Amino acid sequence: MSDMRRREFIALLAGTAATWPRLLSAQPRLPRVGILWHAANEEEEAIYLGAVRRGLSDFGYVEGKNIILENRFPAEIPERFISLAADLAAIKVDILVAINRIAALAAQRATTTIPIIFVAVPDPVGAKLVASLAHPGGNITGLSNFATDLTAKRIELLKEIVPSMSHVALLVNPNDKDTSRVYTEEAQRAVKKLEITLYPVEVRSPSDLEPAFLKMRDRPVDGLAVSQDGLFDATRKNIADLALNHRLPTAVYSRETVDAGALASYGPSNYGIFRRSGYYIDKILKGAKPSKFPVEQPAKFEFIVNLKTAKALGLEVPPTLLARADEVIE
């Protein structure tokens, strides 16, 4: 190569190198969505994380390609919700998604400027997360999973499946004291109407589950209703297994717990609620203001029965009840 050509080549390289920083800075910044879960790891949240990803794909988002998800897992430890929400606010995510009431309150404490979307929060007005469902105000909106008397409905369905049931236990998580109080009051109304006895059982963490079932074994409990709570979703397989081992007919909130082996469920589609979060994320990334974006409540409820579990428990589900079921697992 001649000296002239060598000088031209070096000049070309130098010119190209000089443009690299500008080319890099011109790359579009991917939106970052922080998600504050409640379980300990991604494996425990696999179904619902999959639902969020599916919901995002409905609007053209692919994780790692045109959106980044910053997942955080507090393992049901109240203090961890607060610190992880603060971490997500500190890295300036574009949206902070909070899974359950405790996560939403931690997110609210962490930021007043980053848009917050809560998912599966039973009573956002009562929790003082929003001013009203129609006009949330502030930087928070989202999806509620609450409808009145669902706990009562589960107990009523359980009584139809087990007519001899005279004592029913109710699993509640006292870490969320206001919501657990509402569920307990609903259950008390139901048992009064059915003329049976209620036995509330508190479970604060996964390690409390086995002792809770041992307590139920030592009392005349012949049925179990599980209130809707992130802790019980994350430990659904453990709950289903313990209920079967203790031969305790169990009515739960989520169909995923019935898939894991519980007897029956009644409630909104958890998967559907999590998938719907993709719509909220898309709208807010495109400029919608949380303050004017109404909170969505469930409109459809599913009744699922697991006949395999019924058979293992020696129960015969009435044909009239099976006819009302949205799905029967055989």
Question: Model segments located where?
Answer:
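Short hydrophobic alpha-helices and adjacent helix-cap/hinge residues
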Residues: M1-E330
